[in-house]
């Protein structure tokens, strides 16, 4: 009879320090999001799955734990999925049940979603991608918290450089004898040049249980927080539209985050006060080697109070 191998992971570690997260990353699964009266959306999703580890245990049984994780994910993705954050919550809760030495389980999911839409001026069919972000954390004796959100790309224009160009245009028009009222009307109707950036907006909402927000509504708030939306396919009228819209709506990186805050408050006024909203904006500078970044993390109640006080 073969001798059973020792369970090394269950032994005492050399250093008795607990770990907040131990697990696996880069777990790829096909996920189908069910839709009523339509074909499901198929995602190639990548998961990160973690549990906490008490100070008296050396490891988490990585190989066996991976099998548990894989089986749990497979069970979850076989069932009809309407909200990916709910799926993450279910997986986290199952993992917590199957690990008697852990008190917290976290599941994070990232996936790329292809959007079909039309260009703004010529109505050409076009496609673009967004990154879906979903996660959940299950804890003993506490409601599971779920998060849903997206990373999107858009365009921004710097108000400062635009203002300098407007002043240059104002002086030149005055030198040419154009009246002050005509100059003012021209500058109002024809936004002046400013250096542009490709903007990256991230917007997520986390709440106890289901955040109860529509993913595509979150995407719209994030895209509209920048100076203009962008499109992969574009005829000249579409290029003109994007250029005009972005310059007529010039924004600093800080403005984009504040626009997201206002959009969340207006679009999701049903959210609980303790829902956590994360808003990030990163702009790829066109005239500098560095980039610009701004962000805010706040509970919805605080965000609503701040947005309301500014009206």
UniProtKB/Swiss-Prot annotation:
The keyword Metal-binding applies. Pfam families: GCHY-1. Its EC number is 3.5.4.39. Pathway: Cofactor biosynthesis; 5,6,7,8-tetrahydromethanopterin biosynthesis. One of its GO terms (molecular function) is iron ion binding. Its cofactor is Fe(2+). Converts GTP to 7,8-dihydro-D-neopterin 2',3'-cyclic phosphate, the first intermediate in the biosynthesis of coenzyme methanopterin. HAMAP family: GTP_cyclohydrol_A. Homodimer. This is GTP cyclohydrolase MptA. It comes from Halobacterium salinarum (strain ATCC 700922 / JCM 11081 / NRC-1).
